[in-house]
């Protein structure tokens, strides 16, 4: 068990018998009065956010999750099905995928995250390349400064088409690189 003062962003801990990932940590107090830690967390089983305040000496079990490389196979409403190298299939509920929904594409390789033997979510590669399926053309005269526009990118389920802010020179059918952690455009891979 670790005290709250040793827990870092990204650690997975047990809170009320539920696995929670720490998304943000704010420290308040002083050495005289004692420190408190305000954490923004997410329940890994239900994907619901939660905020709570803990004292520095509160203790938590740190959880180590298993991960396995998988390939996205298909969508069977409301489940997304992934397959590993041995052709085992893992079903993950839509709400547990979070922002990964925006980037999933048939045949995409990622890592399934397991808790207690059950696949609960996936981790995507940090950067991915996606084709722009729709983008407004650049407006003449609107090219000064760092002007951005929205571009819709391809993915497996059209209902989850996602937009990314891109520079004006990016056009429809371009393939762009995106950072999946921040949803930021990185560069054009292919015109």
Swiss-Prot record:
Supply one GO BP term: peptide biosynthetic process
Identify the main location: cytoplasm
Which cellular compartments is it found in?
Cytoplasm
According to its UniProt record, in which pathway does this protein act? Protein biosynthesis; polypeptide chain elongation
Q: Which GO MF term does the entry hold, naming one?
A: translation elongation factor activity
Stored Pfam families: EFP, EFP_N, Elong-fact-P_C
Keywords per UniProt = Cytoplasm, Elongation factor, Protein biosynthesis
Lipid biosynthesis found in the keyword field: no
Q: Which family does it belong to?
A: Belongs to the elongation factor P family.
Function per UniProt: Involved in peptide bond synthesis. Stimulates efficient translation and peptide-bond synthesis on native or reconstituted 70S ribosomes in vitro. Probably functions indirectly by altering the affinity of the ribosome for aminoacyl-tRNA, thus increasing their reactivity as acceptors for peptidyl transferase.
Q: What is this protein called?
A: Elongation factor P
């Amino acid at each position: 068990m670790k005290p709250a003062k040793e827990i870092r962003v990204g650690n997975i801990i047990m809170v009320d018998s539920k696995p929670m990932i720490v998304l943000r940590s704010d420290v308040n107090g002083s050495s005289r009065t004692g420190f408190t830690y305000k954490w923004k967390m997410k329940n890994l089983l239900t994907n619901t956010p939660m905020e709570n305040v803990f004292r520095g000496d509160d203790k938590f079990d740190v959880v180590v999750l298993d991960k396995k490389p998988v390939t996205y196979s298909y969508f069977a409403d409301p489940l997304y099905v992934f397959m590993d190298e041995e052709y085992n299939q893992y079903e993950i509920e839509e709400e547990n995928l979070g922002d990964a929904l925006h980037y999933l594409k048939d045949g995409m390789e990622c890592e399934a995250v397991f808790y207690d033997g059950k696949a609960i979510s996936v981790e995507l590669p940090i950067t991915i390349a996606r084709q722009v399926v729709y983008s407004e053309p650049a407006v003449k005269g609107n090219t000064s400064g760092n002007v951005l526009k929205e571009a819709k990118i391809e993915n497996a389920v059209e209902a989850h088409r996602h937009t990314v802010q891109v520079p004006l020179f990016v056009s429809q059918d371009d393939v762009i690189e995106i950072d999946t952690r921040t949803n930021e455009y990185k560069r054009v891979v292919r015109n």
